[in-house]
Amino acid sequence: MTGLLLKDIRKSYGAVDVIHGIDLDIKEGEFVVFVGPSGCGKSTLLRMIAGLEEITGGDMFIDGERVNDVPPSKRGIAMVFQSYALYPHMTVYDNMAFGMRIARESKEEIDRRVRGAADMLQLTPYLDRLPKALSGGQRQRVAIGRAICRNPKVFLFDEPLSNLDAALRVATRIEIAKLSERMSDTTMIYVTHDQVEAMTLADRIVVLSAGHIEQVGAPLELYERPANLFVARFIGSPAMNVIPATITATGQQTAVSLAGGKSVTLDVPTNASENGKTASFGVRPEDLRVTEADDFLFEGTVSIVEALGEVTLLYIEGLVENEPIIAKMPGIARVGRGDKVRFTADKAKLHLFDTNGQSYRA
């Protein structure tokens, strides 16, 4: 089994550049998730790794071998798509065996791999069924099993859960997590726009925007220490609250004046040259707490209350023009619409970004 190395990978369609010099080193056995909004280039990058898209510039290495000009079938890669791509007239067994038959593997080897993959994915009772007799989640497991049978160097998943309903999505996500544990030596790359999938499955997450890598890191690293405003607002749901601010004091701690005049001190170091500059103050909804103390972070009027049972979302007006601040309270919050509420948060949970959106913590 092997890793994958991307060096200055670029992709253009005519005069339009869509992937801009990607550098990424994926180690053997890593589960790496590409995540980002629609149009960020994550699926294009995955297709380039698979050999389905030509590489415009840069070098790609699999197992130390440069594969820019190696056809997809020779790269040692198996891919699972959003659509299951199963042959409707073939049984589950035949669908899983098809690629090996084309490769002229022996009947004994085909049977061993198919039954091994079926046992791993709990598909053994369904081997004689046609795809139409399976649920969506079972069909996706067949597609994954077909990929396992190829014994690939690298697994590629292109939004494999997008066609499933919420309950099946959770169940299949758990199956993929178990698969990753059982095949711990196999490198896996997974594309999704769903941050829950990214946070729960990945060893490392690659956040992409407009064909650029914004940040690479472990899930909690991206959540707790976002490199910039884009990552801060993309990772986490609801998104991080961002309030315009002005830096009023610098040093090992930084003081800022928030929109509305409230002064806040953060455990974030800044240089003296930053004094007087505009900045963006950030705090996650789940890090806010209601307080009655005079030493509060900010206050505002509750415009909407969404009581979800497990949590309550409070939408606060009056701090940012045309955008409410969101507070995520555990359980049932005894707060009503129209109430004026004060909020606080631990200093360690506060973020500050410069005029270019880069974190002062980085």
UniProtKB/Swiss-Prot annotation:
Domain ABC transporter stretches: 4-235
Binding of ATP, residues: 36-43
Transcription as UniProt keyword: no
GO cellular component, one term: ATP-binding cassette (ABC) transporter complex, substrate-binding subunit-containing
Keyword Cell membrane: yes
Domain of life: Bacteria
PROSITE patterns the UniProt entry points to: ABC_TRANSPORTER_1 (PS00211), ABC_TRANSPORTER_2 (PS50893)
SMART domains membership: AAA
Membrane topology, as annotated: Peripheral membrane protein
GO molecular function: ABC-type maltose transporter activity; ATP binding; ATP hydrolysis activity
CDD domains xref list: ABC_MalK_N
Keywords of this entry: ATP-binding, Cell inner membrane, Cell membrane, Membrane, Nucleotide-binding, Sugar transport, Transport
Localization: Cell inner membrane
NCBIfam families linked: PRK11650.1
Role, per record: Part of the binding-protein-dependent transport system for alpha-glucosides such as sucrose, maltose and trehalose. Probably responsible for energy coupling to the transport system.
PANTHER family: MALTODEXTRIN IMPORT ATP-BINDING PROTEIN MSMX, MALTOSE_MALTODEXTRIN IMPORT ATP-BINDING PROTEIN MALK
Family (UniProt): Belongs to the ABC transporter superfamily.
This protein's name: Alpha-glucoside transport ATP-binding protein AglK
